Swiss-Prot record:
Record key words, sorted: ANK repeat, DNA-binding, Lipid metabolism, Melanin biosynthesis, Nucleus, Repeat, Steroid metabolism, Sterol metabolism, Stress response, Transcription, Transcription regulation, Virulence
Domain HTH APSES-type: 37-143
Region entry Disordered, spans: 135-180, 209-229, 752-774
Keyword Repeat: yes
ANK repeats: 348-377, 467-496
Protein location: Nucleus
Disruption phenotype: Exhibits increased susceptibility to flucytosine. Also leads to hypersusceptibility to SDS. Reduces LAC1 induction mediated by nutrient starvation and leads to weakly reduced melanin production. Expression is significantly reduced by nutrient starvation.
Skewed-composition ranges (Basic and acidic residues): 155-165
Protein name: Transcription factor MBS1
Amino acid sequence: MGPIPSTRRLTGTPHSFISRRAPPECMWYVCMFANLEITFYDSGVPVYEMVCRDVAVMRRRSDAYLNATQILKVAGFDKPQRTRVLEREVQKGEHEKVQGGYGKYQGTWIPIERGLALAKQYGVEDILRPIIDYVPTSVSPPPAPKHSVAPPSKARRDKEKETGRTKATPSRTGPTSAAALQAQAQLNRAKMHDSTPDADASFRSFEERVSLTPEDDSSSDTPSPVASVMTDQDMEVDKMGMHMNMPNVTLSQNMEELGAGSRKRSAAMMMEDEDQFGHLRSVRGNSAVHTPHGTPRHLGIGMPPEPIGPEQYTDIILNYFVSETSQIPSILVSPPHDFDPNAPIDDDGHTALHWACAMGRVRVVKLLLTAGASIFAGNNAEQTPLMRSVMFSNNYDMRKFPELYELLHRSTLNIDKQNRTVFHHIANLALTKGKTHAAKYYMETILARLADYPQELADVINFQDEEGETALTIAARARSRRLVKALLDHGANPKIKNRDSRSAEDYILEDERFRSSPVPAPNGGVGKVSTSAAAEKPIFAPQLYFSEAARLCGGQALTDITSHMQSLARSFDAELQGKERDILQAKALLTNIHTEVTENGRSITAITNQAAPLEEKRHELESLQASLKTKVKDALKKGYIGWLEGELIREQRWEKGELEGNEEEKAAVQALRDVPTGGQEVVQAEEEKLRWEIEEKRKRRAMFVEKFVRAQAEAGTSEQIAKYRKLVSAGLGGVSTNEVDELMNQLLEGLEEENDNQVYNTSAGESGPSSWVQ
């Protein structure tokens, strides 16, 4: 197993490095004519191209259509503004939208008349006149210089040195004349008689004539289709006046040169989704047949089988990814002992894990990880497989990203050569039209997984790349509100500024201003722009309205509306502040009330705790009083029974005549036995009188019992009570001690009322003027 590529890490963070998208490549043939270039792109469409203000402006040769997107770039519109102008004005008329493929060729194409009007409307007609007014002639343009190609990766060169297999590759530098190209075409036509036509012949013939040109990343981040795949019709340079027919030739041993060089360079450009491989598969369908073991068998005459080794492993794996076969190569299912899963399989340094992650093939990812593939391995740009997986929409289309992220999540904190994190690449995906949903899907998956690790998330979510950009600033430039909201909800800082001294907050406000009131350009048109200033941003503000009436409506009317809305906002804000103050005062009063209630509750609790022993004593006193009453009643009852028995005995003695000596007692008994005279009524009246007297005596007896019990309860405190009576009498002045008990209730009520008045006056003094207390 080869060494794992070196990694760069965030400070204090293990396993960290992050990557930038590799620049797209395109096979083209360029001929200079004055300041114009005649260009063939991977689609085979010839165009005239002129660089103006660092923008490649194109005009198709076949129908003279102009690229409206490029015209707006020259006019100084940024991406959000271009999108709005295209939707409002350009796309309502005749137009053709080109998406996919080489980045510069993409955009909205319009007839030359509409393109001229658009250039005039936004003040760039003069500087675009050369490409608009150019008339093709029969004179052949001078030969174009060859475009240099980035050398193969270091790992690839080292492997070639070790195996001693040095490939013979055509020269990548130096001019090539048209005559030389014609001679090469004649040589190819001569070879046609000795070979069988094959769809892959364009690989060899085109490799001998045309070089790859890496496109600067600033122009487009959209990967191109495999650039080396060209049809016969694509290769007919007769369309350029070169009279060069490119026939097919048989794929022979020269395929060894092409397969390891051109094919790997072209295959290194990953597709945004697998459907973009269709053109490659249709051309390569007959040139490579997959055996049950996943090894390509090239069709040719008398080709001896080659030994299988590490060099062939990379070819087999790469062929698997760029073909439509669904059978996984056997070297991935059962890896040989000399199989290195971290070996790069193309000239951009991508490993098999990079390809599998980018294409959303989770099963292959698991096989590679089992074989020892490193999730921290980086390509030439130090991009990790996780970064490559979020640069395309394949994982979104197949809804495989959560499962894939669980396998790769330990590389979340990695950074690449541009100091970009995986969040930068997700936000960068949102810049591509139609990819916002995929970017949101990736972002929400990662943020949900990292929500339990806020410290680590805070370290990486606000990380700045070499341009000072954070993921939030890129998302704000992409005008993706969902991405912006997701990042803000998880702690992204909108005030971090990039090298242009602009923050995400600035981009958001700029977008809102653009939506509400676009800034028109002055009526005076555009001044001359010097050559040195051509590379800088235009010094004028682009016009968004063609007519004067539209400019007036979009100017003064919007200003008046804005002024009224601001006045309404200020009025509403002032009223809201007043309401807020009232609410604060009410809350303060409520807090005071709650405080008083709490304090009173505590006082009641304290008094209750203090009175608890008194309650026990009260119960004890009541128990003693009840016991005393019972004893007194029992004593009285016993005395009554004794008296009654004595009376009965005395009456019995009287009847027996034993009271002879005691006349007084005898007279008393006789009086009791005498019946009143006067009839029955007198007797009943006498009985009623006696009953009443008995009842009165009983009540009086009960009263005396109560007094006796109270006297017993107050026993020992009578002297103290007497002193209290004297003290109260002296305080009242003129009230005798005997009247104190009768006035006690009135005195108590007066004291309670006076206490209540003092409490009220105290609270009023705290919340109002002192005169209220007085």
